[in-house]
């Protein structure tokens, strides 16, 4: 750059700083670049598939899927993981369906959880914005976008037409809160439902509620599906779950993870540790026996997972090695598939070790 351009640029930068404050425009090379901080999802395979070890702070995340696919369970698991590090979490329960007892079983500290059950969509989004602007809340869950009913629709008659009201509400709210979320370094997760588009001949007829704004503003979008049942004999005790990362602005997208959700216990984390440990050569498997550093830890995956629950330090040690090996090496594609493959072969449901 020649001297005239340098002087002109310096003058422009000086004027911008005087008018808008220091830091309004910066050279990226003047500041040390750090990795994006993340909060674990509670699923080791999903954390690895996301590429940064969890969901990014300071961003908007959308989790959508059919009914009973595990959307709320996954978000409660995120809250439980965040609270372990002392984070303050809030749950905006627009569906008025949060079960504190179930949340407690998943590891959520219910006493410290902030809960709001707003009457209208405007109220829910205003509360969300105020919590973000407080700079004191680390994780906010909005459950769900479909339940953010505009005030005009609530006060109107049943059957009245309100075309595009919810989409306009979401678009306006997201324009307002996105910058605040980045400044507060707060993770905001919107749970969304699936609807069917009428008259679609080609491509998927599925779409999410609330218009297109959330699709654009979200840094990460997760499509969660129930793919099968976890059985103990004839009794169904859990769900086989697949999560596909359909959008990811912080790492390569379109990866997926598979894990199990056990009813009343949550994500079967110790099972994931065993399977990923075997796939990475950290846990030895000989026949039905599993061993770690030459010491047998159980016959069958269920018993090995139970051993990790009884010895959490060993489980944490194996998990740390898996994260370092996969995240630093960038070997993240299909990280959860190994966990799902062995899970179907073993009698996982016997384990009392839900985590």
Swiss-Prot record:
GO cellular component terms given for this protein: cytosol
Binding site for ATP: 65-72
Pfam families in alphabetical order: RecA (PF00154), RecA_C (PF21096)
Domain of life: Bacteria
PROSITE patterns attached to this UniProt entry: RECA_1, RECA_2, RECA_3
Biological process, per Gene Ontology: DNA recombination; DNA repair; SOS response
GO molecular function: ATP binding; ATP hydrolysis activity; ATP-dependent DNA damage sensor activity; damaged DNA binding; single-stranded DNA binding
Keywords (A to Z) from UniProt: ATP-binding, Cytoplasm, DNA damage, DNA recombination, DNA repair, DNA-binding, Nucleotide-binding, SOS response
Protein family: Belongs to the RecA family.
Role according to the record: Can catalyze the hydrolysis of ATP in the presence of single-stranded DNA, the ATP-dependent uptake of single-stranded DNA by duplex DNA, and the ATP-dependent hybridization of homologous single-stranded DNAs. It interacts with LexA causing its activation and leading to its autocatalytic cleavage.
Name of this protein: Protein RecA
Organism: Pseudomonas putida (strain W619)
Gene it is expressed from: recA
């Amino acid at each position: 750059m020649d001297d005239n351009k340098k002087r002109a640029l310096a003058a422009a930068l000086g004027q911008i700083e005087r008018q808008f404050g220091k830091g309004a425009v910066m050279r990226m090379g003047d500041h040390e670049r750090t990795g994006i901080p993340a909060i674990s999802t509670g699923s080791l395979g999903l954390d690895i598939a996301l590429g940064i070890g969890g969901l990014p702070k300071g961003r908007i995340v959308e989790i959508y899927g059919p009914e009973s696919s595990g959307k709320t369970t996954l978000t409660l698991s995120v809250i439980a993981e965040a609270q372990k590090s002392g984070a303050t979490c809030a749950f905006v329960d627009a569906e008025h369906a949060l079960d504190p007892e179930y949340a407690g079983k998943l590891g959520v500290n219910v006493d410290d959880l902030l809960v709001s059950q707003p009457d209208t969509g405007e109220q829910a989004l205003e509360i969300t914005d105020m919590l973000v602007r407080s700079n004191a809340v680390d994780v906010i869950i909005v459950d769900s976008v479909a339940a953010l009913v505009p005030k005009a629709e609530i006060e109107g008659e049943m059957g009245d037409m309100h075309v595009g009201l919810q989409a306009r509400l979401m678009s306006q709210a997201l324009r307002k809160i996105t910058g605040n979320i980045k400044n507060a370094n707060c993770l905001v997760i919107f749970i969304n439902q699936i609807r069917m588009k009428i008259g679609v001949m080609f491509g998927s007829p599925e779409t999410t509620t609330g218009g297109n704004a959330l699709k654009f503003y979200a840094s990460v979008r997760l499509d969660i599906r129930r793919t099968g049942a976890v059985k103990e004999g004839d009794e169904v005790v859990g769900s086989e779950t697949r999560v596909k990362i359909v959008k990811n602005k912080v790492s390569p997208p379109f990866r997926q993870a598979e894990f199990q959700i056990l009813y009343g216990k949550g994500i079967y984390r110790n099972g994931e540790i065993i399977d990923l440990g075997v796939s990475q050569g950290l846990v030895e498997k000989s026949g039905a026996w599993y061993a770690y550093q030459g010491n047998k830890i159980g016959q069958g995956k269920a018993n090995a997972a139970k051993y990790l629950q009884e010895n959490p330090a060993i489980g944490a040690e194996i998990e740390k090695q898996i994260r370092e090996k996969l995240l630093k090496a960038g070997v993240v594609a299909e990280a959860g598939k190994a966990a799902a493959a062995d899970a179907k072969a073993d009698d996982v449901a016997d384990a009392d070790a839900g985590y």
